[in-house]
Amino acid sequence: MSPVDFLQDSSQLSYESIQVPHDWMITDTLDLYKNSVGFYKKDFILQNTADSHVAIRFEGVYMNCAVWVNNKLAGEWKYGYSTFEFDISSLVHDGTNSILVIAVYQNPNTRWYSGAGIFRDVNLIQKQKMIQIPEKEIRYAGKCIKHRRKKSCRVK
C-alpha cells in the first residue's frame, strides 16, 4: 500500500491535536501490529518565499510516507528509520501554507516494536537562495610550499 492511495481519505477525517514526535500505534496496545495509516496536518506561515530556499526535513517517519504541501505532492519516502528532506520552494507562498503527511504501517516488517508515525523531529528550513557561480568564472592563484619533506599547496 502506498500513502498516495489514502489521499482522498484525508479530507473526510477529523483531526486531533498531538505533539510531534508521535507514535499512533502505541495508543491501541491491544493490537500493536495491525496494518494502519496515520494522517498528520499542519498549517504554517511563511514570508519572503520568493527570495528563499525552503525545505522540510524529517528526522524519522515510520514506515512509508508521502508529503503534500498546499495539495501538491512534495515527495515520498519508503525507509522508515532514515532522515530525509524535500525541497518545497516551488510549493510554498507568502502567507498560510499547509502540509499533509500520510504514513502507512505494514506488518510484518520487524522483529521488535517499531512504532508508527512521525517518531522524530520535523524541521522547516528557510534560507536565502544561493547563487551558483559557473566554474569558468572562478579565478584562483596558488603556490606550493615544502613542509617537512611533504608537498602541500596553498590557495590564495
Annotate each predicted stretch with a short phrase:
Residues 129-156:
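Surface beta-strand/loop "capping" patches
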Residues 15-22, 29, 146-156:
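Short, intrinsically disordered, low-complexity segments enriched in Ser/Thr and Pro
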Residues 30-31, 35-134, 141:
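Accessory beta-strand-rich segments of carbohydrate-active enzymes
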Residues 1-26, 45, 102-105, 124:
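Accessory carbohydrate-binding/adhesion or oligomerization-edge regions at the termini
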